[in-house]
């Protein structure tokens, strides 16, 4: 592996380099979003409409047996469905009535798959009619394998659910205040006992564990900002009200479709901010929200310094090391920015799909971070070709490769340290306090490699 890297002085005019290949994708199917969304939305039921292959994938990927009675199920398509010999509406009605009788959820989410796309099942046409008959809302989301990354399944579901949010009725006085928000000095408030400041409504979107939701909400409350709701909420009946006067901000970089729906369909105003991953990203996320809502942020610099001090045990392990992102879950840009701030060199940042408008603030912060740390700008490759990537890995010899599960073992067999990118999807990585979990995941293969080197040098006696 490469030794400590000393980078030359970087030209301040240097910018990020973007490339696009036509690579193949080794990633999970987007219907895997069911695994975390059915737990997040507690009164929901997810019905995946697909073939036996979809059922096998969900059974193996989620690891939940039928005896556990999870709040999701498979509606398996048979040959008669594909050849149009069966009435799709009657079959779906029978299943939904059974779901209502057994579970009585507040909402049923139909997840379309590749097969429903190919045979042109009119799920959107059947859902409203069936919804009135059974008396339960039905949300249709086509989270199929035609997307670029498996995390975009959540994006599809949230975009469909955003259309079901109630409309917020704005008053004339509120509209005037929104057009010219006044900067509110937040320095005189006394911690949690302070009253919430007057500001436009704010809704955050992105599925996070309840503990992380509470932490991010509390961080904004400390600045005097009230969060009017989250999309998705823990219960479908508690969806936030949306409208022209509402500001929205995302917490994940793979929610560009949801952001577009909120702006176009619900007329919300999007706060384009970096994502709250790492101390630097969390601070920038809070500061951008405060600036847009007209609140002067306080105490964030000291808060960030304390978090960096708590990471001192991890930073020496990553400082000067190199990392290569093959691209899997669309979190690559945010993780590359945070690891660059930690002192790592990012050779390449592969990403399955990049919405430059939605991730504009994140890309700008990555560029600024590289200039401040005096390191080369990473090469950002959209839709990377794995064959060419492996050639570049052999040439660059990075200390760590963050890749999907399909490519991890072959790379390990060639003596390359790898980390499963899917672990960052399911770990709690958002907010100030969870920065340690990110570095714990990154340093684990590095520490394992160091232990192997030590054991080979000191514990094995040379043959006489």
Curated annotation (Swiss-Prot):
Cellular component terms per the entry's GO annotation: chloroplast
Molecular functions per Gene Ontology: 4 iron, 4 sulfur cluster binding; ATP binding; metal ion binding; oxidoreductase activity, acting on iron-sulfur proteins as donors; oxidoreductase activity, acting on the CH-CH group of donors, iron-sulfur protein as acceptor
Family annotation (InterPro entries): LIPOR_BchN/ChlN, Nase/OxRdtase_comp1, Protochl_reductN
GO biological process: light-independent chlorophyll biosynthetic process; photosynthesis, dark reaction
Main subcellular location: plastid
Protein EC: 1.3.7.7
Cofactor section: [4Fe-4S] cluster
Keywords from the UniProt entry: 4Fe-4S, ATP-binding, Chlorophyll biosynthesis, Chloroplast, Iron, Iron-sulfur, Metal-binding, Nucleotide-binding, Oxidoreductase, Photosynthesis, Plastid
Known pathway: Porphyrin-containing compound metabolism; chlorophyll biosynthesis (light-independent)
Quaternary state and interactors: Protochlorophyllide reductase is composed of three subunits; ChlL, ChlN and ChlB. Forms a heterotetramer of two ChlB and two ChlN subunits.
Cited NCBIfam families: DPOR_bchN, PRK02842.1
UniProt family annotation: Belongs to the BchN/ChlN family.
Described purpose of this protein according to its UniProt entry: Component of the dark-operative protochlorophyllide reductase (DPOR) that uses Mg-ATP and reduced ferredoxin to reduce ring D of protochlorophyllide (Pchlide) to form chlorophyllide a (Chlide). This reaction is light-independent. The NB-protein (ChlN-ChlB) is the catalytic component of the complex.
Protein name: Light-independent protochlorophyllide reductase subunit N
């Amino acid at each position: 592996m490469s030794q400590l890297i000393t980078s030359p002085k970087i030209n301040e005019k240097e910018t990020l380099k973007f490339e696009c290949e036509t690579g193949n994708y080794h990633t999970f199917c987007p219907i895997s979003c069911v695994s975390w969304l059915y737990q997040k939305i507690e009164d929901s039921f997810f019905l995946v409409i697909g073939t036996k292959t979809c059922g096998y994938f969900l059974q193996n990927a989620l690891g939940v047996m039928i005896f556990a009675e999870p709040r999701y199920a498979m509606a398996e398509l048979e040959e008669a469905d594909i050849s149009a010999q069966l009435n799709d509406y009657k079959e779906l009605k029978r299943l939904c009535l059974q779901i209502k009788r057994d579970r009585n959820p507040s909402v049923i989410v139909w997840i379309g798959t590749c097969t429903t796309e190919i045979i042109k099942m009119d799920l959107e046409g059947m859902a409203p009619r069936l919804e009135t008959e059974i008396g339960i809302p039905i949300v249709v989301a086509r989270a199929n394998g035609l997307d670029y990354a498996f995390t975009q399944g959540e994006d599809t579901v949230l975009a469909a659910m955003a259309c079901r949010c109630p409309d917020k009725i704005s008053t004339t006085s509120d509209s005037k205040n929104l057009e010219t928000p006044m900067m509110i000095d937040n320095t005189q408030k006394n911690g949690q006992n302070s009253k919430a400041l007057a500001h436009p409504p704010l809704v955050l979107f992105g599925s996070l564990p309840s503990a992380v939701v509470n932490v991010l909400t509390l961080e904004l409350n400390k600045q005097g900002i009230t969060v009017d709701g989250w999309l998705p909420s823990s219960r479908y009946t508690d969806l936030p009200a949306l409208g022209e006067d509402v500001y929205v901000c995302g917490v994940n970089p793979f929610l560009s479709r949801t952001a577009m729906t909120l702006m176009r369909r619900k007329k919300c105003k999007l706060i384009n901010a970096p994502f709250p991953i790492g101390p630097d990203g969390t601070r920038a996320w809070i500061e951008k929200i405060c600036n847009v809502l007209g609140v002067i942020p306080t105490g964030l610099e000291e808060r960030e310094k304390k978090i960096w001090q708590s990471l001192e045990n991890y930073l020496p392990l990553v400082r000067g090391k190199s990392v290569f992102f093959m691209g899997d879950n669309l979190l690559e840009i945010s993780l590359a920015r945070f690891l660059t701030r930690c002192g790592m060199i990012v050779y390449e940042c592969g990403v399955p799909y990049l919405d430059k408008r939605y991730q504009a603030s994140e890309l700008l912060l990555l560029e600024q971070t590289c200039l401040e740390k005096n390191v080369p700008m990473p090469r950002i490759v959209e839709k990377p070709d794995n064959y060419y990537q492996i050639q570049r890995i052999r040439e660059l010899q990075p200390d760590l490769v963050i890749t999907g599960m399909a490519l991890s073992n072959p790379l390990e067999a060639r003596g390359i340290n790898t980390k499963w990118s899917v672990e960052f999807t399911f770990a709690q990585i958002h907010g100030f306090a969870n920065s340690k979990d990110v570095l714990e995941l990154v340093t684990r293969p590095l520490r394992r490699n160091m232990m192997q080197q030590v054991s080979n040098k000191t514990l094995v006696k040379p043959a006489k």
